[in-house]
């Protein structure tokens, strides 16, 4: 998935938490893009079966939520480490992590997400934090 498509998927998901129904114009306004740009991106996400359009409303599919969760697991992990260990601002760390995650192959992305989840589960089971206390990446659920 391109970083642009991921931004649209994130926007649709975030708007769904705020609004009763999400429309194409809501996404366009949220991302400060034209309706045509939003339409094209939404169509690409629909073709990949990440979203559905029901009565002009945009809804994430189960597949869309699953893929988004995988991407966000990696993005949160990477951005936390970039901020903490590299002195990168939070906003820049998030952008860099999002772009890097989108550059991964599907196989690599899946492997990294599974690794992070297993590390988080290990930290939860031991009552600690991921990769030792100096990492600062606390388990979020």
Predicted features and spans:
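Basic, amphipathic "hinge/linker" alpha-helix immediately C-terminal to the N-terminal HTH DNA-binding motif
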Residues: 56-74
């Amino acid at each position: 998935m391109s970083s642009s498509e991921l931004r649209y998927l994130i926007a649709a998901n975030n708007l769904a938490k705020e609004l009763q129904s999400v429309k194409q114009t809501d996404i366009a306004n949220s991302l400060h893009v034209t309706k045509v740009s939003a339409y094209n991106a939404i169509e690409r996400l629909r073709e990949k079966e990440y979203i559905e359009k029901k009565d002009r409303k945009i809804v994430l599919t189960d597949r869309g939520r699953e893929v988004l969760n995988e991407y966000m697991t990696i993005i949160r992990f990477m951005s936390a480490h970039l901020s903490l260990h590299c002195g990168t601002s939070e906003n820049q760390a998030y952008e860099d992590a999002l772009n890097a995650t989108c550059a991964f192959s599907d196989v690599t992305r899946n492997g990294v997400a599974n690794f992070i989840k297993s590390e988080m589960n290990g930290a939860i089971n031991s009552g600690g934090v991921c990769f030792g206390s100096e990492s600062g990446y606390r388990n979020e659920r």
